[in-house]
Regions:
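Bacterial Sec-dependent N-terminal signal peptides
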Residues: 1-30
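Oxyanion-binding "anion nests"
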Residues: 246-295, 299
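Extracytoplasmic mature domains of secreted/periplasmic and thylakoid-lumen proteins
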Residues: 109, 114-174
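Acidic/His metal-coordination segments adjacent to aromatic residues that form catalytic metal sites
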Residues: 50-53, 98-105, 156-161, 221-235, ...
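Inter-helical turn/loop segments and adjacent helix faces that build the functional surface
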Residues: 81, 182-193, 252-264, 317-325
Length: 411
């Protein structure tokens, strides 16, 4: 926990010095509790991090999937409710990170990391608004990574170059929705089959029939110490990995034509995931555990990022007709559980979301075994972007369901 304390101290120290200098100092330091939850969380994040590059506790510039996740959700809030400051906040990160020639600060294509692709999704919208060619070039640069990204024999992308032969559920979210949207926006219909294959391939490699869950990852080569020698699968089903996978479905399906071969197979898998989410929901709180296949076990805990991801995916899945309307009850119970158990509001109305796993992975230089003790002992922190972003998205779905029509200041 010490590392998190130090990071938070540094971030807060930097922010206190920058607050008076930031154009967002005009943003009220109080949050109106009468506003919708999605807007309240966005305004709270903008208070915590006056400069958008500071999201995810960053003391310096970083091109990262967390920024993409949060800024995408913020643009959704802007689209629904207005407030130009929200758009400008997202634009500031894009303008800072994308150079005039379309290169991206801190992005190294040759690393072949799917994590670096996710932020491209909000850049689509920035380009759509600005028509600045540098964003079009940046999108093409990220898309070109996928042409040469290392793959397994079945066409599945490696999660990263440093993780050879490995398929992580996290990576499906990081790469596939961007891939699908790029194909849609650029009339590259031949790519849909490859996008769909990423989902189907991940399901084949990670499904655990004994526990009826999808495990965090699979090493197709069976060489990693964390991998089962027969299946190649990791030891457990990590909540957030399943959350990433579920969100990937509902976001990518937006762009894949209904007639496309294999799309129906995606829907079958997503329906299976929805049934797993329903079965694993904690009956008392409506939430989900950090390690899904050990729900309720000693040391396991109800975790906010997977809970918000599941709720968003179910809400959107029902709205889009991907899953049965009966799942709406599961989503509503989960959303209310999030508000009751994870959301805190301070005296100024600033909203926080608590109890998020900061990070979890497999292998690496400081080796991560992927056993039960590993997952339950990773750092837990508040206002992690991987909980904040999906909470905003889930809240927007809830507000759409309630037909909330609050008009936020559009100046």
């Amino acid at each position: 926990m010490g590392g998190t304390y130090i990071r938070n101290f540094i971030c807060n120290f930097i922010l206190s010095g920058l607050l008076l200098l930031s154009p967002l100092s005009m943003f009220a330091q109080r949050v109106d509790s009468n506003l919708p939850w999605s807007v309240r969380m966005v305004e709270s994040e903008m208070i915590r991090c006056p400069e958008s590059w500071q999201l995810d506790f960053q003391p310096k510039l970083k091109w990262d999937y967390c920024h993409g996740l949060e800024l995408q959700s913020m643009l959704d809030v802007y689209d629904r409710y207005g407030n130009r400051k929200i758009y400008d906040y997202a634009l500031a990160y894009a303008d800072t990170m994308v150079n005039a020639d379309g290169t991206i600060k801190m992005y190294k294509r040759e690393e072949y990391s799917l994590d670096r692709i996710n932020s491209g999704k909000f850049i689509f919208r920035i380009y759509e608004q600005t028509k600045d060619e540098k964003y079009k070039k940046a999108l093409a640069l990220m898309r070109s990574q996928l042409d040469e990204h290392p793959r397994n024999a079945d066409g599945g992308f490696w999660h990263k170059k440093i993780y050879p032969n490995q398929v992580w559920l996290d990576g499906i979210y990081m790469g596939a929705p961007f891939y699908a949207e790029y194909a849609f926006r650029n009339n590259q219909g031949d790519d849909y089959a490859d996008v769909i294959n990423q989902f189907l391939m991940a399901a084949r490699h990670t499904y655990d029939p004994k526990n009826d869950v999808y495990r965090h990852a699979c090493d197709v080569s069976r060489k990693e110490r964390w991998a089962d020698p027969v299946t190649g699968q990791s030891k457990h089903s990590w909540g957030r990995a399943m959350g990433w996978y579920a969100m990937a479905f509902v976001d990518a399906l937006d762009f894949i034509p209904k007639h496309e071969a294999g799309r129906d197979s995606m829907l079958v898998i997503f329906n299976k995931i929805a049934s797993q989410i329903k079965r694993l929901q904690d009956s008392k709180t409506g939430l989900w555990y950090q390690v899904l296949d050990k729900s309720g076990a000693p040391g396991n805990y109800l975790e906010s990022s997977c809970s918000t991801m599941f709720v968003y995916s179910l809400f959107k899945g029902v709205r889009k007709g991907y899953i049965d309307k009966s799942y709406l009850e599961v989503a509503v119970k989960g959303y209310k559980g999030i508000l009751d158990n994870f959301i805190e509001v301070d005296k100024n109305g600033v909203v926080s979301i608590t109890k998020a796993c900061a990070v979890a992975g497999l292998g690496g230089k400081v080796y991560r075994s992927g056993d039960y003790d590993y997952y339950i002992n990773e750092t837990i922190r508040n206002n992690d972007p991987k909980a904040v972003g999906p909470f905003i998205l889930a809240s927007l779905e809830w507000e759409r369901l309630q037909d909330v029509k609050v008009i936020v200041n559009r100046k």
